[in-house]
Amino acid sequence: MRRSALINIMVKAADKAGRQLLRDFGDVEHLTVSRKGPADFVSQADRRAETIIRDTLKEARPEFAFFGEEGGQTGPEEPEGRWICDPLDGTTNFLHGLPHWAISIALEQAGVIVAGLIFDPVKDELFWAERGHGAYLNSRPLRVTRREDLSASLFATGLPYKGRDNQDGMVASVERVSWASAGVRRAGSAALDLAYVAAGRYDGFWERGLSAWDVAAGGLIVNEAGGRVTDFEGGNRIVSDRSIIAAAPMIYDQLLQLVRPKSGA
């Protein structure tokens, strides 16, 4: 698949930031780290990577706004589009020397995500998609798994840090899915979890308490790989609802029933 000019701009930004992140990862013990909330950290690496991505995208498309995890939204008041970026998804993994983290960049136009990219610099894996044109890992087309048997399926999730009640509900859903399936993994990067669903490595993923930069790119990539992506009510408000379920079509309904909030959960 030949990449469009927009995807090439995103790839350029991710590649530049990825090289900086790899340098920081090799010197992680010397990074300055601060805490944004319970178990929610930000480092020099996050900020440096976001600056690189923002500046690269702004130079190429000054008419677009930029919405990043660390710096909020900048750019024109009436932009033609908006970049949505997590410069380092999996910061806690990164700071502990675990090589499981990624860069996530999406482009939103008229309220619709039209392009998305997730880049894992450690493995040199680039997951990307454009609406209506399929999803790819580097240059290889992606398809979600065709597995139909829930008991043989492998899932991924994350547990929220904000609010005991919210976490208790997620723990309960993890227990239900674990009993019904081949297992549940919590690897610490929602972006890569979604990319792995698109690649057929996981059969599905669900999580609550996420932000736009966590799901914007990954949700599109899963959709373009043939998966189903909704919020916990089965709707399409994955950004505003702050919840997401993404799965292969034959597994989706079964997963939704298991993870949908129950009374008291």
Where are these regions (language model features)?
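N-terminal subdomain of lithium-sensitive/metallo-dependent phosphomonoesterases centered on the IMPase/IPPase/PAP
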Residues: 1-88, 250-257, 261-265
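Small-residue (primarily alanine) positions within well-ordered alpha-helices
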Residues: 10, 14-17, 116, 135, ...
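Residue-level signal for inorganic ion chemistry
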Residues: 21, 46, 57, 91, ...
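A short, compositionally biased
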Residues: 28, 101, 129-133, 223, ...
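Short secondary-structure boundary/capping segments
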Residues: 33-34, 58, 73-76, 118, ...
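Acidic active-site catalytic centers that drive phospho-/nucleotidyl reactions
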Residues: 40, 44-46, 50, 69-70, ...
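DPxDG-like acidic metal-binding loop motif
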Residues: 77-136, 151
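An extended, acidic
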Residues: 143-265
